[in-house]
Amino acid sequence: VVALIISALIRSLLMQLYVIPSASMENTLQIGDRGAVIKVADFHRGDVVVFKDPGNWLGNETSGTSNPVRQVAEFLGVAPSSATDHLVKRVIGMPGDHVACCTAQGQITVNGQPLDEASYLYSVNGVSVHPSDLSFDVVVPAGHIFVLGDHRNDSRDSRYHLCDAVESGEVAGSGGFVPISDVTGPMVGIFMPFNRATRFAIPATFASVPDPAPAPDQPTVNRKPC
């Protein structure tokens, strides 16, 4: 029993399980999928990450209250988290990255490099959705990331929150960036249902993105969709 408890405690420090609550990451993640997040792993441009709501992105939604047994199981990492104050998106921009939409061909660019997103964007009958119907042009500040859902037409992500109201003294558009300190970790794959079990890899298109300039302390928002 002691060995099982120790094992569970170690697992709780290293890994957390999450249930996907929405369609914003389809087709990569479906509603009800169980994903595994590694808490101690670094993440990179192109990774799928879970993060705490950085600024009322979820509106009035709040975490439900689960029973004590469930809470212990979640803490130990043996039951998927039932919290509703976390989101899952794909990292498009890391600190210093210049992210813009869109080219004449309709592609998002990172540091001037167009992304070929066909491998992960939501698709219907093999036809991917447009990378973004919203125009934006930003430089990601130090200590933050820029995230998008794979189902771009059904995802309230960094694009939308560039238009959020900000506190006095903050740069307009600051609400569109997620503090790295709010990131739980990268989601490494789906473990349930078993017929969808898979391990995630960073899409090949991100390997062509050049290194960014040094990240500014404050975001640069050249264009936002509002």
Model-derived features: positions:
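A short acidic/basic microdomain associated with nuclease active sites
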Residues: 22
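Soluble "head" domains of membrane/secretory-pathway proteins
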Residues: 13, 18-19, 31-226
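Membrane-proximal juxtamembrane linkers immediately C-terminal to transmembrane helices
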Residues: 25-31
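Hydrophobic membrane-insertion alpha-helices, especially the h-region
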Residues: 1-13
